[in-house]
Amino acid sequence: MTLSGCGGNSASDAKSASGAATVKVMVGGLDKVIYLPAMLTQRLGYFKAEGLDVELLTEPAGVQAETALISGDVQGAVGFYDHTLDLQVKGKKVESVVQFSHAPGEVEVVSNRAAGSIASPKDFKGKKLGVTGLGSSTDFLTKYLAVRDGVKTSEFTPVAVGAGQTFIAALKQGSIEGGMTTDPTVATLVDQKLGKVLIDMRTPEGSQEALGGPYPSSSLYMNADWVDSHKQTVQKLVNALVKTLRWMSAHSPEEIAAKMPADYAQGGKALYAQSIRSTLPMFTKDGVMPENGPETVEKVLKAFNPNLKSAKVDLSRTFTTEFVKKVPQG
């Protein structure tokens, strides 16, 4: 299925063999619990029920999903909402059409080796800290936590280590002393006694404490022009994803885990279910942007991002609730 996000080739023109509209979506790590609604929607058959043939592709970092969207390789990206602000300042019109979460789902961990010397972000000075990729949301949030606690972004080194096994290997080898990651990586490294949790942003309370408000993170975001010219397709995508968020709110972590591909539970079924349990509080039940969420994200990004510091961001153009408000009830 080759489909370009710009030009004449579009989801409304492209049909799969079954006659369903074809949409390509790049996910910043399909096996990350923070992006779980994407694959779960596929597994529950909700995309198909809406008459869509959705191809889910994966990249280890959200920033790579953003790149695929901007280049027109895909029509949608599942990644952090904060990319929409960053892109607007760079002259790109991108908007979140459904918001999966109201907290980052991220955790700052420290290796056992470094635990004695890192008690808070004040101690980031001189340290090597893992992020999924440079320019990724983990990079953004690490920089914010440092700046908030009086450490300049030039005083520590962010290291791109991805997530999962590559993150764990970097921690084991000592090439990073800590870093920001999500479940199931967090559950695995704690279970293997390789490190401990320093800052937990998997819940709205954790987001409030670390960032001063709700931090809408994982979302489906798309080029605004594409959204405007494919409203029917976007509505179907949003219907399917919101149906999944509702399903998640009514089922146990074990029931959710059982629906996912078996290879996502690399640390075993029980540990995978535990990682879902830890991250579940971050998800919305309706896909609606949380109140004050965009403002929190703007405040966080402006604290350290020179591109955004003095820029005027039109937050109303970074997301839309047009589609989530039209999702059928029940």
Question: What are the functions of these language-model segments?
Answer:
Residues 35-38, 44, 66, 81-84, ...:
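Extracytoplasmic/secreted envelope proteins and their assembly/folding machinery
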Residues 295-330:
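Conserved C-terminal helix/tail region of periplasmic/extracytoplasmic solute-binding proteins
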